[in-house]
Amino acid sequence: MIKTILKNSYIQKEITTHSATVIFSHGLGDSGAGWIEVMEEIQSRNNGHIRFICPNAPIQAVTLNGGFKMPSWYDIKSLSSRGDEDPAQVDESKNIIETIIKHEMEEEKIPAERIIIGGFSQGAALSLYTFYSQTETKLGGCIALSGYLPLATKFVANSLNKEQPLLMIHGDCDQVVRHQWGKLSFDHLKSQGINGEFITLKGLGHHSSPEEIDLMTKFISKTLPK
């Protein structure tokens, strides 16, 4: 399974000494290729010891887009509400991320606390769910860009990662994943005792920006120092 997952992932291999890993998941309809240049930019800022892995989501039907098949971590039925995600599909995609984590720990000998998971939009949602579902693996941290917590109405953070750092960034002009959804998800997690920061970027829509990349870089460099 891991060979197939890694074969279908974009991996930055030009590193000095591999002592840390960032696993970053793309949004709906995108691919890992859409983020590898951003990861290379972050790596170039004195983060040559970090390997960046950008996995590709499975191709599956998305109700929101009339059943059209596209890269998707799980089905999305509507943009009007949250919490109607398919638990089985969310868990299947969580298993993909967990398989990569296990590979980095066992084959690359990277300690769990030297691994950050993160993503954009649906990939951010998957990362939040995966991060706070861990009961045996204490990771380094989590990054969620323009994201939200899936299955939020049923989700309870029962995780070793409650004390680990979370960075959530959301634009206040996001018309796809509303800013309020991200903030509500953060508040829900915060009420359960997680250690995190929510940053609002003025004028930012449903995309990234140089300011956001700067914030990501600082978080990654601080969490995964040489």
From Swiss-Prot:
Its EC number is 3.1.2.-, 3.1.2.22. GO terms for molecular function: carboxylic ester hydrolase activity; palmitoyl-(protein) hydrolase activity. One of its GO terms (cellular component) is nucleus. The keyword Glycoprotein does not apply. SUPFAM superfamilies: alpha/beta-Hydrolases. Pfam families: Abhydrolase_2. Keywords: Cytoplasm, Fatty acid metabolism, Hydrolase, Lipid metabolism, Nucleus, Serine esterase. InterPro entries: AB_hydrolase_fold, LYPA1-2/EST-like, PLipase/COase/thioEstase. The keyword Nucleus applies. It catalyses: S-hexadecanoyl-L-cysteinyl-[protein] + H2O = L-cysteinyl-[protein] + hexadecanoate + H(+). GO terms for biological process: fatty acid metabolic process. It is found in: Cytoplasm; Nucleus. It is an enzyme of class 3 (hydrolase). The active site is at S121 (charge relay system), D174 (charge relay system), H206 (charge relay system). PANTHER family: LYSOPHOSPHOLIPASE-LIKE PROTEIN 1 (PTHR10655:SF17), LYSOPHOSPHOLIPASE-RELATED (PTHR10655). Belongs to the AB hydrolase superfamily. AB hydrolase 2 family. Hydrolyzes fatty acids from S-acylated cysteine residues in proteins with a strong preference for palmitoylated G-alpha proteins over other acyl substrates. Mediates the deacylation of G-alpha proteins such as GPA1 in vivo, but has weak or no activity toward palmitoylated Ras proteins. Has weak lysophospholipase activity in vitro; however such activity may not exist in vivo. This is Acyl-protein thioesterase 1 homolog 1. The lineage of its organism: Eukaryota, Amoebozoa, Evosea, Eumycetozoa, Dictyostelia.
